[in-house]
Curated annotation (Swiss-Prot):
Record flagged with keyword Glycoprotein: no
Keywords: Ribonucleoprotein, Ribosomal protein, RNA-binding, rRNA-binding
Highest taxon listed in the record's lineage: Bacteria
GO MF term set: rRNA binding; structural constituent of ribosome
Function: Binds directly to 23S ribosomal RNA and is necessary for the in vitro assembly process of the 50S ribosomal subunit. It is not involved in the protein synthesizing functions of that subunit.
Keyword RNA-binding: yes
UniProt family annotation: Belongs to the bacterial ribosomal protein bL20 family.
One of the protein's GO biological processes: translation
Record's GO cellular component terms: ribonucleoprotein complex; ribosome
Protein name per the record: Large ribosomal subunit protein bL20
CDD domains, alphabetized: Ribosomal_L20 (cd07026)
Source organism (scientific name): Wolbachia pipientis subsp. Culex pipiens (strain wPip)
InterPro entries the UniProt entry points to: Ribosomal_bL20, RIBOSOMAL_L20_CS, Ribosomal_protein_bL20_C
Length: 121
């Protein structure tokens, strides 16, 4: 039976890892064993932070909506409650976009919500 050498496969695997480790500091960029550890850790961070990014953006949208609502005399919580009462079904991403880039439309929304809240209380 012929001997099978696996040098080609090993070389390709090493090359793939070292390509992913491009730009790393020290031996992590050119020493396979260290590069492999760093690349695996980088992939773990990437996986974790893809999930954290969703949390971070939601927090950012809430901060922006709260700031814009407070300019008009409402808190974030009362504003969101008012939106539910009025029946406006806009998500936080769109509301934050309106608060930053379409201030006049957001102000009209605040007026509608304020009148509904005053009517209900």
């Amino acid at each position: 039976m012929a001997r099978i050498k696996r040098g080609t496969a090993t070389h390709a695997r090493h090359k793939k890892v070292l390509k992913l480790a491009k730009g790393y500091r020290g031996r992590a960029k050119n020493c396979y064993r260290i590069a492999l550890q760093r690349v695996e850790k980088a992939l773990q961070y990437a996986y974790r932070d893809r999930r954290n990014r969703k949390r971070d953006f939601r927090g950012l949208w809430i901060i922006r909506i709260n700031a814009a609502a407070r300019e008009h005399g409402l808190t974030y919580g009362r504003f969101m409650h008012g939106l539910k009462l009025v029946g406006v079904d806009l998500n936080r991403k769109i509301l934050a976009e309106m608060a930053v880039n379409h201030k006049d439309d957001f102000a009209k929304l605040i007026e509608t919500v304020s009148s509904k809240l005053a009517e209900n209380s």
